[in-house]
């Protein structure tokens, strides 16, 4: 199989689809890998590293897309849509429930798109989303602490406080991978941390994990309102695989927050959980202020720490990439049900229910679309 690794073009997206070690594994399995010039430089992997791993370095973006399978990090941008072709396998993060134009382009060009975030194991965990959720969760507490500083628009709060001065209050909505990792860093910074989740069993697990050092609260509209309005930092970390994020924090709740408080919407690439995060921001211009509250809505947070993120992502995605390359997508889906759940579009059909519902499009199951 011929595989392409394009350079990411999203604002300040410095990750790359595969590290040189991942490329080497594919080449050793008998596949041809084309890597776009400087694709890995943002993660401090040079072209020579890929060449030594067995890749062919190509300068033309069109050439790196003219392959059997493209492995990326983030969803393609509009300038990349012309490279779509029937039968192309696209393996990347897609978050299509918040991307109607991209979804339509994939359907129109009959692309076989496999989204990292909807690959799901029997225990409902997301093995290809998990490493980036860990990174984004940990970053969210660090970023929140930074933007609470007065010089960054915040109210001038030190999360850990000092003797005689209260700690900063951090509320995390969602107790999954991202929320749990946000709590770890917030606790490490000395904050007073509360996690809200809808699953009592998960709250029990979090209580055990943190030894009672965080407040674990059932998530419902009244509790969300109560804790949001008294918080200095609110982190949104709710995920429904493949579907749009629920808008759990209303504009009225935001209006009740203190001036200079901060919200971090980790779920912004799925639409966000705050009614007031009405636009996606970038690493170049990461925040805006609405109702006196600092809003951080960067959709590719892990892109700011690309070396760590690329290596962690490569560890997770490589076994699936090898499966797709070695077996072909049909046999790979037959033999690996979690991978088949990653299929979002197939030759003109939407094969993810959450995406179909988001845009009122016709849905076909993977089995029906592929006639497995």
Curated annotation (Swiss-Prot):
InterPro entries per UniProt: Ala_DH, Ala_DH/PNT_CS2, AlaDH/PNT_CS1, AlaDH/PNT_N, AlaDH/PNT_NAD(H)-bd, NAD(P)-bd_dom_sf
Binding site for NAD(+): 169-199
TM spans (from-to): none
Catalytic activity: L-alanine + NAD(+) + H2O = pyruvate + NH4(+) + NADH + H(+)
Molecular functions per Gene Ontology: alanine dehydrogenase activity
GO cellular component entries: plasma membrane
Active site residues of this protein: 95
Gene Ontology BP annotations: L-alanine catabolic process
Keywords: NAD, Oxidoreductase
E.C. number: 1.4.1.1
Superkingdom of this protein's organism: Bacteria
Family, similarity comment: Belongs to the AlaDH/PNT family.
Name of the protein described by the UniProt record: Alanine dehydrogenase 2
Native species: Staphylococcus aureus (strain N315)
Lineage: Bacteria, Bacillati, Bacillota, Bacilli, Bacillales
């Amino acid at each position: 199989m011929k595989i392409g690794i394009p350079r990411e073009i999203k604002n300040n997206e410095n990750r790359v689809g595969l590290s040189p070690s991942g490329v080497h594994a594919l080449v050793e399995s008998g596949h041809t890998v084309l890597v776009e010039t400087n694709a890995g430089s943002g993660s401090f992997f040079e072209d020579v590293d890929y060449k030594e791993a067995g890749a062919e370095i190509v300068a033309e973006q069109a050439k790196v897309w003219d392959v059997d399978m493209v492995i990326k990090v983030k969803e393609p941008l509009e300038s990349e849509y012309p490279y779509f072709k029937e039968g192309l396998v696209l393996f990347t993060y897609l978050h299509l429930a918040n991307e109607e134009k991209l979804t339509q382009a994939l359907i129109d060009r009959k692309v076989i798109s496999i989204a990292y975030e909807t690959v799901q194991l029997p225990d409902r965990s997301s093995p290809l989303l998990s490493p980036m959720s860990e990174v984004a969760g940990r970053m969210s507490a660090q970023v929140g602490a930074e933007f609470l500083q007065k010089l960054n628009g915040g109210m001038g709060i030190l999360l850990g406080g000092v003797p005689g001065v209260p700690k900063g209050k951090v509320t995390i909505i969602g107790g999954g991978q991202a929320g749990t990792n946000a709590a770890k860093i917030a606790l490490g910074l000395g904050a007073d941390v509360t996690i809200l989740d809808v699953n009592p069993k998960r709250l029990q697990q979090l209580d055990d994990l943190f030894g009672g050092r965080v407040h674990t609260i059932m998530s419902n509209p009244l509790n969300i309102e109560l804790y949001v309005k008294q918080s200095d930092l609110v982190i949104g970390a709710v995920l429904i695989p493949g579907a749009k994020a629920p808008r759990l924090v209303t504009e009225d709740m935001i209006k009740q927050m203190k001036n200079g408080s901060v919200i971090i919407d980790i779920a912004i690439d799925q639409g966000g959980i705050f009614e007031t995060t009405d636009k996606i921001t970038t690493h170049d211009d990461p925040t805006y202020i609405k109702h006196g509250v600092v809003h951080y809505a960067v959709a590719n947070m892990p892109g700011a720490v690309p070396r760590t993120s690329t290596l962690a992502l490569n560890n997770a995605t490589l076994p699936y990439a090898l499966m797709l390359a070695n077996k072909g997508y049909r046999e790979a889906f037959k033999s690996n049900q979690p991978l088949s759940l990653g299929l979002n579009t197939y030759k003109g059909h939407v094969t993810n229910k959450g995406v179909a519902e988001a845009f009122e499009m016709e849905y076909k199951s993977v089995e029906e679309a592929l006639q497995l």
